[in-house]
Amino acid sequence: MKRVLLLSSLCAALSFGLAVSGVAADGAALYKSCIGCHGADGSKAAMGSAKPVKGQGAEELYKKMKGYADGSYGGERKAMMTNAVKKYSDEELKALADYMSKL
């Protein structure tokens, strides 16, 4: 009986984990943490000098965020963006880039 209960619990836990990981990243929800610097509609020049995200394509935005994450992109003040994007998965960065490209 204990073995059946243990096996059932394990299966339930694995099923829950698969269901959670299968949820698509929500670019709009992720963008909420970007509004302070980039503005609600993406038209704000972050730190007074960055190109607004509004009007940029998804692929361009994705490449820039990946570059910030790995240190290959950005100017003197890239530390803030590097720290901001490092926490996101590749799927989340793509969802975020897709959302921003539609602002």
UniProtKB/Swiss-Prot annotation:
Record function comment: Natural electron acceptor for a formate dehydrogenase.
Gene Ontology CC, one term: periplasmic space
Entry keyword Repeat: no
Binding of heme c, residues: 34, 37-38, 81
UniProt modification remark: Binds 1 heme c group covalently per subunit.
SS bonds (residue pairs): none
A Pfam family that the UniProt record links to this protein: Cytochrom_C
Annotated protein name in UniProt: Cytochrome c-553
Signal sequence range: 1-24
Xref: InterPro entries: Cyt_c-like_dom (IPR009056), Cyt_c-like_dom_sf (IPR036909)
